[in-house]
Amino acid sequence: MIKILFICHGNICRSPMAEFVMKDLVQKANLQDKIYIESAATSTEELGNGMHRGTVTKLRQENIPFTNHRARQITAQDYNNFDYLIGMDQENLYYMEKRWPNDTDHKISLLLEFANLFRDIADPWYTGNFDKTYADIQLGCQALLEKIKERI
């Protein structure tokens, strides 16, 4: 089982969007018994809160199924429990590298790196642009799934 943890600042916008987009792609590829997906936050600001209404609205518009979600923070154990620790922007990466300073297994990356794009996925909490965030996440998740398919 390959395990993926998507990570953003609050775990209410980008990382849960990536979690449910990836789950949808995995389901459509009939790989749900081979790939496990979760999401988490670098901060404690939104712990226990549900997804942002903009994220919920965008997932519904795109017919991406989702379940009840409550924000959680990354833990030290996540490094051992997941194969991929995927951030959305440089700030996420900074806090991930602080939490797991010895990434000897090279698990830490940014989502758009899988699509050979070396830029951040903008936080719609600040931009209000959930469409752009969704497009970037969809692009990154599709590329990540293709990479994972090579391993299984």
Predicted regions and their residues:
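Phosphate-binding/catalytic loops
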Residues: 84, 90-152
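Conserved active-site segments centered on acidic
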Residues: 1-81, 146-152
